[in-house]
Amino acid sequence: MGTQFRKALTLTVTNFSQKSSPINSPPFPSGGCNWYIKFYPKGSADDNYLSLFLSPDDPKSLGLNWKRRANFYFVLLNQSGKELHRTPEIGDQWFCDDSLSWGFPQTLPRKKLLDKIFLDNDRFNIEIYIKVIEVVEGYHMFPASFTNKLLRSSLEYPDKSEKETVDINGFKVLSSQVTSVKRIFEEHPDIAEDFRSKNQVVKTEYMSVLLRVIETMAKPPQSISETELSNVHSELTELTEVGFKLEWLKAKLEEVCVAFKKANADGCRIQQLEEHVKNLEQTVSDLKVEMDKEKAKSTAKVLSLEDTLSDLKTELGKEKAKNATATDKFLLLKDTYSDLKVELEKEKAKSTSAAAKVLSLKEALSDLKVELDDQKIVNSATTANVLSWEDDDDLFSHTNCLGIQQKTNAYKRIN
């Protein structure tokens, strides 16, 4: 048995957040039988956890008292190959009819995985690494069920195109099968020595199964499906159990399995690359949609800004018109101010001239007052002299008085 763990299968889970029902992986071979992964997106017992289990694919085909002792573990990865979670290793557990499944009921909290793959298109991969340590083969009773199945197939679906059969070494085969059956007996003459059934219909159907197995294994590995390979394995086991000596065909099956694994690995790689390309294309498509949305928002914003700019230009034009009117008013007031200032200067000049004239008149009046006072003094002295004179002096006095009166009248005219 193997001593090294090997990656036996990669199961891709898509739209994880929407999944609730259990998912079974395709079967894969290891340790002489097929296995499959059973994945519970919402847990086998608790909705808050993921559950992962490993089971034999068809335990009834393994016979009675079969056993497989195996170690295995699971790895969860995102689409980029980054490890999200690795389970502990389950070691030395026996799988048998009483224990058909082993695994992890609480592999990982569901919410934790959802958070990790939120930005990874809601998908991830599950890998299983297995090492079968010990195999206990089961034994089979006469496979009546398989024989009955062949009989039913023969009775329910008879070949209408060929009715003629040819006997080759006790097997009645169709004429189209003669060449192939002859070659088998030529290369392996003891192939049917231990075949136990005497029913000719059953023998014919078993030979048809053998030819179908050989035909399938003759295909190119990349054109064989996993289901076909699994069927070949089961049918080869059944043929061996009813007495066909097929060690040479088992060796050929091992070669086909190796070639199939290689082709499948290459195919998985291509599939992963195709998935990656699809993911990238989806991402580009999503980004394009997002970009179109942003472009629409940006266009709307530009239009809004253009409308605002247009409104501001209109408002600016109005303000300019108002400013032009205010400027005209200012210039008019400035001209009026200048005119008034000139008029004021003129009036000030006139006022200065009048003040000078008044001052001159005041000075003349002052002089007249002084002269009048002097005259009064003179008159007082004259009066005293007149009193001492005789009437013969009246004429002189009259003459002097007349002169004073004339001067007074002259001053009055000036005033």
From Swiss-Prot:
Q: Report whether Protein biosynthesis shows up as a keyword of the record.
A: no
Q: Which residues cross the membrane?
A: none
SMART domains, per the entry: MATH
In Pfam terms, one family for this protein is MATH_2
Record InterPro entries: MATH-CC_domain_protein, MATH/TRAF_dom, TRAF-like
Extract the coiled-coil ranges from the record.
244-341
The MATH domain is annotated at 6-130
Which UniProt keywords are present, listed alphabetically? Answer: Coiled coil
Show the Gene3D superfamilies listed in the entry.
Apoptosis, Tumor Necrosis Factor Receptor Associated Protein 2, Chain A (2.60.210.10)
PANTHER family noted in UniProt: MATH DOMAIN-CONTAINING PROTEIN, TRAF-LIKE SUPERFAMILY PROTEIN
Q: What is this protein called?
A: MATH domain and coiled-coil domain-containing protein At2g42465
Protein species of origin = Arabidopsis thaliana (Mouse-ear cress)
UniProt lineage: Eukaryota, Viridiplantae, Streptophyta, Embryophyta, Tracheophyta
